[in-house]
């Protein structure tokens, strides 16, 4: 096993750990989920480039009669990339005291202002940065509004 194979195993393990955390662990952290809203995906061109480069590496490894384990590891990395970028659905998960956005926990008390843009992007101003929340279905913005003004997140609006 070469150092390249070890690096590939490390990347595969990191992507697998992220996928498990995103799908199974994060929704169970910080209490019960009050609302989970699917978000729009970001540009897919990065994922096409990533998977395309992996396919080129697989082709190069096969034509140069490289190690079979390297080919399998590159294939596994391509499949993990395909899952992360194309199958997995990004979402915002609202809990009792805050929400997960881009896999980061944000408490409601950190929100300084909220605005809705004309194109349906919810903008939340935090202490030092802005969150641009692009929901997949525009009707989900009403669900978010109802959750934030209900008793579940009333401390945010006081």
From Swiss-Prot:
<dbReference type="Pfam" id="PF06173">
    <property type="entry name" value="DUF986"/>
</dbReference>
<keyword id="KW-0997">Cell inner membrane</keyword>
<feature type="transmembrane region" description="Helical">
    <location>
        <begin position="45"/>
        <end position="65"/>
    </location>
</feature>
<protein>
    <recommendedName>
        <fullName>UPF0266 membrane protein YobD</fullName>
    </recommendedName>
</protein>
<feature type="topological domain" description="Periplasmic">
    <location>
        <begin position="1"/>
        <end position="5"/>
    </location>
</feature>
<dbReference type="GO" id="GO:0005886">
    <property type="term" value="C:plasma membrane"/>
</dbReference>
<dbReference type="InterPro" id="IPR009328">
    <property type="entry name" value="DUF986"/>
</dbReference>
<keyword id="KW-1003">Cell membrane</keyword>
<keyword id="KW-0472">Membrane</keyword>
<feature type="topological domain" description="Periplasmic">
    <location>
        <position position="66"/>
    </location>
</feature>
<feature type="transmembrane region" description="Helical">
    <location>
        <begin position="6"/>
        <end position="26"/>
    </location>
</feature>
<feature type="topological domain" description="Cytoplasmic">
    <location>
        <begin position="27"/>
        <end position="44"/>
    </location>
</feature>
<keyword id="KW-1133">Transmembrane helix</keyword>
<feature type="topological domain" description="Cytoplasmic">
    <location>
        <begin position="88"/>
        <end position="158"/>
    </location>
</feature>
<feature type="transmembrane region" description="Helical">
    <location>
        <begin position="67"/>
        <end position="87"/>
    </location>
</feature>
<keyword id="KW-0812">Transmembrane</keyword>
<comment type="similarity">
    <text>Belongs to the UPF0266 family.</text>
</comment>
